[in-house]
């Protein structure tokens, strides 16, 4: 592996979402987004709900992630997410329908969490 690259694995309980060498990442941490470049300091952090951006050259790959952990060590990045989806695996029309139905429900913490996850998947699918 080149010293200018990051070895990245993004894994959910269902499948390996991404595996490869990349130039940089933008990760949705539980306390906010943070960037990862080669030679980043070692770190273990929790993931929030959000968009994970993976950049390799001019190509940008986006995924939705819903919690989990990220570990950075020696240019190797392991992302374990509770649930994740690649842009191409998200059905935009289904997510829009889910959003419309959820917005009709009475306020609750579970509704807010569902809305946040659904809106993230819609953003990923729309990019």
Swiss-Prot record:
SUPFAM superfamilies xrefs: Epsilon subunit of F1F0-ATP synthase N-terminal domain
Parts of the chain that traverse the membrane: none
Keywords: ATP synthesis, Cell inner membrane, Cell membrane, CF(1), Hydrogen ion transport, Ion transport, Membrane, Transport
A GO cellular component annotation in the UniProt record: plasma membrane
The keyword DNA repair is assigned to this record: no
HAMAP family in the record: ATP_synth_epsil_bac
Family: Belongs to the ATPase epsilon chain family.
NCBIfam families, per the entry: ATP_synt_epsi, PRK13444.1
Name this protein carries in UniProt: ATP synthase epsilon chain
């Amino acid at each position: 592996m080149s010293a200018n690259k990051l070895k990245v694995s993004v894994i959910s309980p269902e499948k390996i979402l991404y595996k490869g060498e990349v130039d940089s990442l933008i990760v949705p941490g539980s306390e906010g987004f943070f960037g990862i470049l080669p030679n980043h300091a070692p770190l273990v952090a929790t993931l929030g709900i959000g968009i994970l951006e993976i950049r390799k050259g001019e190509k940008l790959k986006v995924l939705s992630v819903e919690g989990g952990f990220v570990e950075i060590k020696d240019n190797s990045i392991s992302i374990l997410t509770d649930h994740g989806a690649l842009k191409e695996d998200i059905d935009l029309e289904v997510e829009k329908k889910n959003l419309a139905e959820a917005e009709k429900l009475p306020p609750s913490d579970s509704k807010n969490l569902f809305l946040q996850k659904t809106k993230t998947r819609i953003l990923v699918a729309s990019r």
